[in-house]
Structure formats: structure tokens, C-alpha cells
Amino acid sequence: YDVALGAEVLDLDSRMGLPSEDVMKAAMARAMDEGADPELVEKMGYGKTAIVATMKFSDDGPVVAFRADMDSNDVIESKASNHTPAKNGFRSRHEKAMHACGHDTHMTMGLGLAEYIATHKDGLKGTIKLIFQPAEEGVRGAKAMVEAGVVDDVDLMFGMHIGFNEQLSNCFACSDHGFLATTKLDAVFHGYSSHAGGSPEKAQNAMLAGCTAVINLQAIARHSGGASRMNVGVFESGIGRNVTPDVATLKLETRGATTEINDYMIERTKTIIKGAAEMHDCTFEITKQGETPAGRISDDLAREVQSIIEPLGIFKEVPFDYSGGGSEDCAYFLNRVIDRGGRATYMVLGSAIKAPHHNPLFDIDEEDMLNGIVALGTIATHYLK
């Protein structure tokens, strides 16, 4: 494989939600302490953790791409004795860095696919690209790879996710039409603190601005054009019971069945935050931390995948579609390939998960990974012959 990484496969200006420089420096130092290759740390440090592996078989034939996301969640993994990773010694080494969404299995299957292709390459035509993407959580990483042109030559694009629910166990869904467009925002209100008993009238209460915003954000009218979502997941304010809060921070997200519906939610959000600030004589700032459009699917490609996977006989069901209702920045890859005349789909590998995604007890059935590698390898070789 030819391997490109870091700034070679990222448009650095298109990255979103980067940690602070101090956080990134600390992560690089930790990687070095744990034995990472210094050359790779240099190339991939400071928010450049992206990789594309390419194998070209011939000038004729399609360019086929598979994407695997790599990042963990800010979840503290369970130490319970009934949690298999804890019981068998492979629980997360670092706190608040748990693979609670299965992206470690996506990497594993991506590497398994790489080996599968390397051992089945005789007679293949065209080119395969294996895309390992950072920062799917918070939908922050895919756009930078797309803007770097990573999929501009791709004819067939495939994404996949493992897990979801018990009903999907040992199933392979060939498309997901349930992607919601989403935007992740941080809103900070700035006021003026004073003594809560001695001079409350001199205060500009940022906490009250935040409270006003939260209540009214949750009350945004729904859109007739389709599903919409609003969630304020974090609200931080205050330093003491007798001090009027001068800063309040909200971390929130909007979602919409279409990009247009999500845009409506964003505009209403901005109006409400501005109004809440004005009501309480505060200033405010809004920072975008992540965003993805609604994803599009090539139904004809999904039908073809269904006809390829069903004869394998390794899944109890191979449904055409599973609509999960979440958001995924793989949509950037799918949409770019379709916009440029190619075809794309996003598949779901069902697994009997032990707890919901993003839960401290999340775990998958590892046998499903093996079936996933076979499925991906079969799809790849079908289109590369």
C-alpha cells in the first residue's frame, strides 16, 4: 500500500473543534512516552491524525473507497467484573478515552480489509482506497479530508458502522437513510459579577441568560418538513453561592432530517441566544465545534450490495435499509462522491451490544467483526474484478 497521512490528506483550515494547543502537546508527549514512532507523531500531531492507504492494481477499473473512523468518546469505561474488556484486561488505558461507539472495531475491520485485499489481489483491476478518519465524534473530521480531495477520484464509496441494537444482531443492512444533518455549537454568555446580597442590582447575570436560553431553545417550534432535534448537553456557570455569575457556557447541538431543516434550527438558536443575552444585559459568543450535512445514498448501489452479501449466508438477515436517526460526518464523503458522478452507500453491521452506544458498559460481539471483514472484502473484490 501507498500510505499518505497527516497534512497530506487534510485541509487544515477545514478542521473543526480542535483541542487547545496544550492538550494536543500533552497527547503527543504521552504517545512518545508510550513508544510511538517520533516521525509519525511529528507528522500526525496537532490535530493531523488522518491516514489514507491506496493500492493500485491497474489504470482501468474503478476507484473504490472504504472509510473507517478511529476516535474514542469522552466516556469513563466501566471497571465492572461483568464488562468483558475489564475482565480480560483490555479496558481503556486512559480515562475519558473509551471506544464506546465501536470505532476501534471499525479500525480493526479496516485493517482486516487491507489484509484481505493484499492476499486476494491477483486479477483485481482499478484502485482501492482505505480511509482512516479522525474525529467523527462531534462530526469534526471528515470535512477536512474531503476538502483535501481524498475522494475526488472515487467511483464507489462505502462507509459502515457496527452495533446499534439487539434486533440487528448478526444482520447486515446495506444502506442507512436516517442520517440527520447536525451542528455542534458552544455558546458563552459574559456578564458582570457582584455581591449577591450587597449589590445585586449591579450584576449582569450570565447564568440567568443561560437559563433563559436553555428553556427557549428546547421550545423551538418543530419543522413541518421533517424531523428536528435540539439538545443542550452541558450548562456550566457560577463560582459561589453569594457571587452573581459573570460567565455561562452552553454546549449544544441541532439536528434536522435535511440540511435545510438543520439550518432552520441553527437560525432559531442564534436568535434565542442573542435575545437571552439582551434580556440580561450580557454579551455572547457562539463557536461552531462541528457540523455535517444530511447524507445521501445511491439506492441502486445498496441493492447491489444486498445481492452480493445475501449469498454469503453468514448473516441471518440482509435488509436493504436501516434508519438509525443519528448523524454521521461520513455524509461528507458520500455526498462528494455522488456530486461528482459516483455512487455511495453507508452500511450497518448489526451486533449484540451489551449496552447502548456511548455507555460505560458498551461492548460488541467480536465474532461480528470477522463477518464484517468478509463482507467488506467480498464487496471490494466484486467491484475490483
Predicted regions mapped to residue ranges:
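Acidic/His- and Gly-rich active-site-bordering loop/insert found
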Residues: 1-98, 112, 119, 123-124
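Short Gly/Pro-enriched turn/cap motifs at secondary-structure boundaries
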Residues: 40-45, 136, 175-179, 321-325
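Active-site nucleophile and cofactor-binding loops and adjacent substrate-binding regions
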Residues: 44, 97-104, 322-323
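Histidine/acidic-residue-rich, glycine-tolerant segments that coordinate divalent metal ions
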Residues: 51, 73-74, 84-87, 91-98, ...
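DPxDG-like acidic metal-binding loop motif
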Residues: 107-113
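Metal-dependent amide/peptide-bond hydrolase catalytic core
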Residues: 207-385
